Swiss-Prot record:
Site (Cleavage (non-hydrolytic)): 111-112
Family, as annotated: Belongs to the prokaryotic AdoMetDC family. Type 2 subfamily.
Pathway: Amine and polyamine biosynthesis; S-adenosylmethioninamine biosynthesis; S-adenosylmethioninamine from S-adenosyl-L-methionine: step 1/1
Record's protein name: S-adenosylmethionine decarboxylase proenzyme
Top-level taxonomy: Bacteria, Pseudomonadati, Pseudomonadota, Gammaproteobacteria, Enterobacterales
Gene that produces this protein: speD
Length: 264
């Protein structure tokens, strides 16, 4: 696509949203509690801040403000306000804010921000544990959140990923013509590396005329040892391995397709 000569600021808002899932089987109550504690510590507010700060570097954004919070009994959230233009480091607020940001910041936050929320979860009887991370990278201007696609998926353990990308608003060129998108895209998959595409089965659901793009990803390879917490598959009987494999695979397919499925 030919580079546009714009009149004033690029007013297009580009939003990239992820839902990333990590699935685990923990046999006992103690193991389930241990998994939740492990994943909660692995993705605490400080670690998430590091990931999102690197994301800002990748997409070429400047950090204006960071708000982060760990929650009891589990979970964390981080929100980073970003700008396209360089800012004076002396004016950046890097202090922690456990509550809402000031109104002036919230108003700006709607335009360019990066945020993540985590949701560790377990079933009290079935042994299945799920960690979900919701990430949104929303930018206003020429910054493209798609640049951070590979990095974010690699940084978080991802068995299942759902991705949404949309472009909203319009910008004008020097002749006054409106442009509702400023780059070529027909699939989110085009912004993924070949090694990543080789790891996942993927399906697209796109609404091109509305500039809405959706991709679902499910890990191709299933190795039971990667889904067990503090239990080795070789310590289980054949029937136990088959039962746990069926339960995990059913859980993953239900999350991937977004609906409950009958037991096989």
């Amino acid at each position: 696509m030919k580079k546009l000569k714009l009149h004033g600021f690029n007013n297009l808002t580009k939003s990239l949203s992820f839902c990333i899932y990590d699935i685990c089987y923990a046999k006992t109550t103690e193991e389930r509690d241990g998994y939740i504690a492990y994943i909660d510590e692995l993705y605490n507010a400080n670690r998430l801040t590091e990931i999102l700060s690197e994301t800002c570097s990748i997409i070429g954004a400047n950090i204006l403000n960071i708000a982060r919070q760990d929650y009891e009994p589990q979970g964390a959230s981080v929100t980073i306000l970003v700008s396209e233009e360089p800012v004076d480091p002396k004016l950046i607020d890097k202090t922690e804010h456990p509550g809402p940001l000031p109104e002036t910041v919230v108003a700006h936050l709607d335009k360019s921000h990066i945020c993540v929320h985590t949701y560790p979860e377990s079933h009290p009887e079935g042994g299945l544990c799920t960690f979900r991370a919701d990430i949104e990278v929303s930018t206003c201007g020429v910054i493209s959140p798609l640049k951070a696609l590979n990095y974010l998926i690699h940084q978080l353990e991802s068995d299942i990923v759902t991705i949404d990308y949309r472009v909203r608003g319009f910008t004008r060129d020097i002749n006054g013509m409106k442009h509702f998108i400023d780059h070529e895209i027909n699939s989110i998959q085009n912004f993924m590396s070949e090694d990543m595409k080789a790891l996942y089965d993927m399906v697209d659901v796109n609404v091109y005329q509305e500039n809405i793009f959706h991709t679902k990803m499910l890990l191709k390879e299933f190795d039971l040892k990667h889904y067990m917490f503090h239990t080795k598959p070789e310590d289980l009987t054949d029937s136990e391995r088959q039962e746990i494999t069926a339960a995990l695979w059913k859980e993953m397919r239900e999350i991937y397709y977004g609906r409950n499925m009958p037991a096989v």
